[in-house]
């Protein structure tokens, strides 16, 4: 339960957090008097800051120092005292539209580019997960003869990801087949598969009733059932380690990362323990309004992963319609520009949702 604050207390908390974010220095009443028009005396500010400290929203890192926000102070600041920057949100959308070439680039390169843009605009470590293939649908299936007795099954999803599987021809022929006959048969089967499966999700393929295929293609029926379903199952397995990460070097130069050991644990999480991070930022939102992305802000100790318990993690899910595909995230020490970071993440998630629609 959040502390109930008066308007004056909210205003002074807002000014304290804002000044600390900008300077990384403990904040005293003198600094607030000089920078903000609070309409009260220095003594009143000191008294209010004392109340905020007793409420657990501020604390003194040293006895003689000013005050800095606690996780609880940041939480009220984020939930009650700020509004995400609409100007920066439009700048993000414009940058993504102008700099990304959806027709010419691979999906991985596109998301790497998007992550770099977000890192530049937010000043945070940017994180973008690859789309989950278990939510993808079939764009095209093709069976091709590679050599005598060997064929390849190629699956292209609507995310433009390509997956393939090499297989032997199904048994059951009384004589060695003519390669041209096999090519014609494979094209007929490919056309049949596309007419039945195009637009279906990979999960639907694995539970599809193949009896109709069995009746029309007795020779290929069981073979197709195991081959296509097997490839779809393999493709649909969540790839929990696929995260595009950018902006690490700049963030690690922040004063909060002055200890080498802390830097090492952050880098280890980003490079070697991405599955833990993926499970934290990828969540299926419960949204009534699917036109805009919900943003989750985890501050400091709200993060369950030890390496980022002094950081804030801002994330939002991008999707196709109501189906979650992946997530956009930003992270840096809890002393960050939340108005900008939240706006950047929300705008990027909305852009990707529209792009994948």
UniProtKB/Swiss-Prot annotation:
InterPro entries: GAF-like_dom_sf, HrcA, HrcA_C, WH-like_DNA-bd_sf, WH_DNA-bd_sf, WHTH_transcript_rep_HrcA_IDD
Gene Ontology BP annotations: negative regulation of DNA-templated transcription
Repressor among keywords: yes
The keyword tRNA processing is assigned to this record: no
Transmembrane domains' residue ranges: none
Molecular function terms from GO: DNA binding
Keywords in alphabetical order: Repressor, Stress response, Transcription, Transcription regulation
Source organism, top-level taxon: Bacteria
Family label: Belongs to the HrcA family.
UniProt cross-references to HAMAP family, sorted A to Z: HrcA (MF_00081)
Name of the molecule in the record: Heat-inducible transcription repressor HrcA
Gene name of the record: hrcA
């Amino acid at each position: 339960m959040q502390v109930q604050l008066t308007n004056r207390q909210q205003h002074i908390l807002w000014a304290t957090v804002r000044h600390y974010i900008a300077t990384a220095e403990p904040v005293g009443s003198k600094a607030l008097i000089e920078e903000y028009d609070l309409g009260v005396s220095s003594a009143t500010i000191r008294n209010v800051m004392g109340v905020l400290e007793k409420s657990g929203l501020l604390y003194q890192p040293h006895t003689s120092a000013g005050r800095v926000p606690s996780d609880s102070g940041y939480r009220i600041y984020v939930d009650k005292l700020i509004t995400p920057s609409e100007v920066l949100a439009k700048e993000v959308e414009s940058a993504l539209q102008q700099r990304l070439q959806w027709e010419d680039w691979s999906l991985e390169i596109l998301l790497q580019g998007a992550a770099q843009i977000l890192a530049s605009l937010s000043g945070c470590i940017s994180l973008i997960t690859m789309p989950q293939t278990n939510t993808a649908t079939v764009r095209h299936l093709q069976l091709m003869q590679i050599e005598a007795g060997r064929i390849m099954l190629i699956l292209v999803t609507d995310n433009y990801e390509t997956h393939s599987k090499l297989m032997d021809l199904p048994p059951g022929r009384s004589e060695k087949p003519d390669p041209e006959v096999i090519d014609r048969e494979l094209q007929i089967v490919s056309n049949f598969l596309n007419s039945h499966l195009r637009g279906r999700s990979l999960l639907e393929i694995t539970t599809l009733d193949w009896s109709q295929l069995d009746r029309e293609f007795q020779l290929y029926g069981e073979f197709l059932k195991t081959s296509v379903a097997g490839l779809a199952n393999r493709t649909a397995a969540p790839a929990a380690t696929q995260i595009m990460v950018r902006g690490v070097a700049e963030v690690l130069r922040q004063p909060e990362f002055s200890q080498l050991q802390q830097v090492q644990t952050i880098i280890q999480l980003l490079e070697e323990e991405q599955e833990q991070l993926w499970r934290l930022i990828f969540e299926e939102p419960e949204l009534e309004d699917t036109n805009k992305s919900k943003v989750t802000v985890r501050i400091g100790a709200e993060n369950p992963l030890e390496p980022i318990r002094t950081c804030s993690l801002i994330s939002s899910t991008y999707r196709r319609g109501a189906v979650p595909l992946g997530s956009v995230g930003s992270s840096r020490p809890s002393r960050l520009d939340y108005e900008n970071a939240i706006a950047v993440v929300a705008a990027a998630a909305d852009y990707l949702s529209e792009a994948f629609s």
